[in-house]
Amino acid sequence: MKKILIVEWCCSGLGGDPALLPMSLVCEGKTMLLALMDSLNHAKDLSAKTVLHPNLTSTFPSELALSISPFPGWAELARSFDLLWPIAPETDGILLGLVQKSREAFQTVLIPNDDLIALATDKLQTFHHLKRHGLPTPETFPIESFQAGGGTFQVIGGTFQVIDGTSPPGPWVLKLRDGAGSQGMRLIVQPAELMGLEENRWILQTHIQGTAVSQAILGGPTGPWFCPPCIQQMSKDGSFAYQGGSTPISSDFARRTQRLTERLVKTLPPWLGWLGVDMILGDAVDVILEINPRLTTSFVGLNRAAGGSLAPAIIRHAFGENAVMPRFSAEPIGFDASGNTTEP
């Protein structure tokens, strides 16, 4: 029996007391962790445990959790488990740092390689990668110096300045360069809205009207598996807060999504485990927005569509075993950001 350790950064205490962390990150982390644990522990040949901050132990089944404070060393944990599945936000190098430390102890860490994590974490570098390979993606600029609409513009000392030309055409989407989920995102209509922002941390992307979709791609030694795409539900107040999603999507949307992700995969190194891709299917153009180098909330809906068997299949695929892609239900399944699923 394979013993699997799942470490979710917010819930484990690696980030300190979860009560002091952004609520959206803790909620998303807990949602993914519970769904993943449930899926893995339904497999007879797998056993999964997680590490929890003492303040969260009452919210998890006692048989699934190790309550350890302070967080033990990776070498100590590696002696009791065959595989580590880490989940963490990319922001401030948290995911990459966690993975690099854990690789020193664990022989198998179910996460993309460090170079791919670094590429996907930095949204500006992701943009340059996509452009270099001829993949459609919104124009993306660092706020401290960008060009658009024939002009050159800068944010200096928190003040927006037109260096040359006229004010660039909007609207844009403001994002943290290394943000996780919709952290810090908002719609920008006028350049003056950029005033007061900390330089070097933020980017602007041209706002593309259309339908937000995501697709999970599962890496393993025999090649990638493409999960059914999901519609993403975002708030309409300009903050783009993630509210959940649904699957399956229309056959036309599915073909368009698959066309983009297949092209993307050809530009990436091989990887293990989950890779999420966010896209916009527009009236005029379909674009890739971001790459997520770790588990995303859409796992909740996709695992339900797979009858609860998705996580064990990901493990077997990563180990190069005689794994079979799960069958996903054709019945509509909705899910929210808290992990609740709905079916007709």
Briefly describe each language-model feature range:
Residues L83, G282, A313-P344:
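Peripheral (often C-terminal) accessory segments that flank ATP-dependent C-N-forming ligase machineries
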Residues L116-T211, G219-C227, G244-R263:
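Active-site nucleotide/adenylate-binding loops and adjacent lid/helix of ATP-dependent enzymes
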Residues S39, K49-Q147, D164:
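Conserved N-proximal alpha/beta basic substrate-recognition cap immediately N-terminal to
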Residues V285-V287:
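Conserved protein kinase catalytic/activation segment
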Residues W271-D283:
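A short glycine-rich, hydrophobically flanked beta-strand micro-motif that places a catalytic Asp/Glu
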